[in-house]
Curated annotation (Swiss-Prot):
PANTHER family: TYROSINASE FAMILY MEMBER (PTHR11474), TYROSINASE-LIKE PROTEIN TYR-1-RELATED (PTHR11474:SF126). Belongs to the tyrosinase family. Pfam families: ShK (PF01549), Tyrosinase (PF00264). Residues 453-477 are annotated as: Disordered. One of its GO terms (molecular function) is monooxygenase activity. The lineage of its organism: Eukaryota, Metazoa, Ecdysozoa, Nematoda, Chromadorea. This is Putative tyrosinase-like protein tyr-1. Residues 480-514, 523-557 form the ShKT domain. Residues 1-22 form the signal peptide. Glycans are attached at residue 25. Binds 2 copper ions per subunit.
Length: 601
């Protein structure tokens, strides 16, 4: 009953809030970029509120259940990308658990170690590029990009506290997808503060052919590893229109955020309505990160197209890193997993509420607070630094500006503007002469040093590139499932045609909406991770899904399909239906589903 107590306690807390500020206006933003960002966030929030009302107009019910049905659980679609620890991921990799996960080639599967993009070795960077290209060719990159497009302007992913938790889960899923191709790589982050010191960040090595590539006069990405990436909209190349608006992250942005002690200044209400007792903090990550989207322009500007550009994932990995730095500095372990801004409809649409579903996944927003992300799956390499005693940033693509407070800066690509950095090693493969990078190698940066020797991927990791062994473990069987043992029976009763909304969501296999290679008959497991899910008590907590897909592991081989439908699944629905209760918030159905998921089955 922990969640219910927390909900009731929180409801009482909301009742004592009495100080209400005047209506918020975007003209209060500190500059034109923030004004534009503010208006966009408000537009997306308005669209989200309309979408909630539209969704409430019709709630699909299971066959035989009229109207709103508490028997409708959130979608449960287990996959490697949904895992929260290595033990869960290991079977998808074809590995075995023996003092950790051992891959088929004998190498261990380790936590990801996320480095700044320029701090990767050339080999690491090339392998990451290759994995991303393979992901694009397979169609999985586009499938993940579609997820962001679908939540771009009417969801809990933008315009409120859900922004950080949603994108944390999203970055995790992209990283796991890439590691299914090459288990030894990790998602890099782009510390755009390194560009903020340059007279023209467009001339950074970041936008050279070795990294994110270069654009032509029309803004099309025509060089670099991702040239020729067709967009979701069908354009032959990614579009960038850099530096017409917006700006890079600055060290001051990060310092300002780190100085905040109040959670709602970080997981902020960025599109409040009249009556919200919290004023927006324009130094919040959702605001400041948007300036980089504006600066990149083109596909990166609107959420509907931003994931077309791989730079999106590097940028948001850095956003996640900044958030994690704040968490480590201001919260203990308990607080990190339990502190979430209050659920106030005037401050954020209900898709941002702590117990609202993190659409489109089988999670709730507060799940994104879990320490498991950085305990089990990934951790961050420190940001590049230097000092007067060691003016080496640890990368041939960065240099140390020792004037004033020493700090690392991105090198300028050949022919780029380096004004103000004459006499420093500011040019990649060249020298800064009269404000421009000229050919030549006057400065020789040492090879990578101990600044990056803390990488926890051992030297043998390059041998782990075995996509042919990894991919078949997931691709054929991870997506096509029914979510209820009654699906086949309902399909025979023509429910796929007469109850399409429900059946298309929960009975995709029986309705022929996907293809499965599971042709086995009799009592068996359809999913590769049934043993793991049983260990998580899912035979009790997810009875319907497990009865359909993990019958053998859950010990239900003494029942045929009709008996499973009549007893296991319907018993679960009957308990949920008897415990049904109503809330007043627009996403009450999501809260009911998630509450009952843990306590009603």
């Amino acid at each position: 009953m922990g969640r219910l107590r927390a909900f009731l306690l929180f409801s009482g807390t909301l009742a004592v809030i009495s100080t209400v500020h005047a209506d918020f206006n975007c003209s209060q933003a500190p500059d034109s970029d923030m004004v534009q960002t503010c208006h966009m966030l408000q537009e997306w929030d308005s669209a989200a509120r309309k979408a909630i009302r539209k969704r409430q107009a019709f709630n699909a019910g299971a066959p035989g259940v009229q109207g709103f049905s508490p028997s409708n659980p959130p979608r449960f679609a287990p996959s490697a990308q949904g895992c929260m620890n290595i033990a869960c991921i290991c079977p998808y990799m074809g590995g075995r658990m023996a003092n950790g996960c051992i891959l088929p080639n004998g190498q261990p599967y380790l936590m990801a170690y996320r480095k700044e993009y320029r701090m990767m070795s050339d080999n690491e960077r090339q392998r990451w590029h290759n994995a991303l290209i393979q992901l694009k060719r397979s169609g999985e990159y586009d499938r993940l990009s579609v997820m962001h497009r679908q939540v771009g302007s009417a969801s809990g992913a933008h315009s409120g506290p859900g922004f950080l938790v949603w994108h944390r889960e999203y970055m995790k899923r992209m990283e796991i997808a890439l590691r299914m191709i090459d288990p030894g790589i990790s998602m890099p982050y782009w510390d755009s503060v390194l560009e903020s010191y340059l007279p023209d960040p467009r001339d950074s090595i970041m936008f050279g052919p070795q990294f994110m590539g270069m654009t032509d006069a029309s803004g099309q990405l025509v060089s670099g590893p991702f040239a020729g990436f067709r967009t979701l909209e069908g354009r032959p190349n990614i579009i960038r229109r850099m530096a017409t608006e917006g700006k890079m992250f600055t060290e001051q942005n990060i310092n300002n955020l780190m100085a905040q002690n109040d959670l709602v200044s970080v997981m902020a209400f960025t599109a409040p309505q009249g009556g919200c007792p919290f004023r927006p903090y324009f130094g919040a990550l959702e605001y400041t990160h948007a300036s980089i989207h504006l600066w990149m322009g083109g596909d990166m500007k609107p959420p509907s197209t931003s994931a077309n550009d791989p730079v999106f994932f590097l940028h948001h990995t850095f956003v996640d890193f900044i958030w994690e730095m704040w968490r480590q500095n201001h919260q203990n372990r308990f607080a990190r997993e339990n502190q979430y801004p209050p659920d106030i409809a005037a401050c954020a649409n209900s898709q941002h509420f702590s117990y609202a579903q993190m659409r489109p996944w089988d999670k709730i927003n507060r799940d994104g607070l879990s320490n498991a992300y950085t305990d089990n799956l990934y951790h961050y390499a420190p940001r590049p630094t230097c000092n007067r005693n060691n003016a080496n940033c640890g990368s041939q693509y960065l240099f140390c500006d020792t004037r004033g407070n020493p700090h690392c800066v991105a090198k300028v690509k050949p022919g780029g503007l380096c004004r103000g950095f004459e006499g420093l090693d500011s040019c990649y493969m060249g020298t800064c002469v009269a404000g421009w990078c000229r050919g030549g190698q006057q400065f020789q940066q040492p090879a990578q040093t101990t600044a990056v020797a803390t990488v926890q991927q051992p030297q043998q990791q390059p041998q782990q590139q075995q996509p042919q062994q990894q991919r078949p473990a997931t691709t054929p069987q991870s997506n096509c499932y029914n979510e209820d043992p009654c699906c086949n029976q309902w399909s025979r009763q023509n429910e796929c045609r007469t109850n399409t909304v429900y059946m298309n969501r929960y009975c995709r296999k029986s309705c022929g909406l996907c293809q499965s290679n599971d042709n086995n008959r009799g009592c068996h497991d359809r999913h590769i991770s049934c043993a793991y899910w049983r260990g998580q008590n899912f035979c009790t907590r997810r009875r319907q899904w497990m009865a359909e897909n993990c019958q053998a592991t859950c010990g239900w081989c003494n029942m045929n399909e009709a008996q499973l439908c009549a007893s296991v699944a319907r018993q679960s629905r009957r308990v949920r239906r008897n415990a049904k209760f109503w809330l007043t918030e627009p996403d009450a159905d999501d809260f009911v589903d998630d509450f009952m998921l843990d306590y009603g089955r």
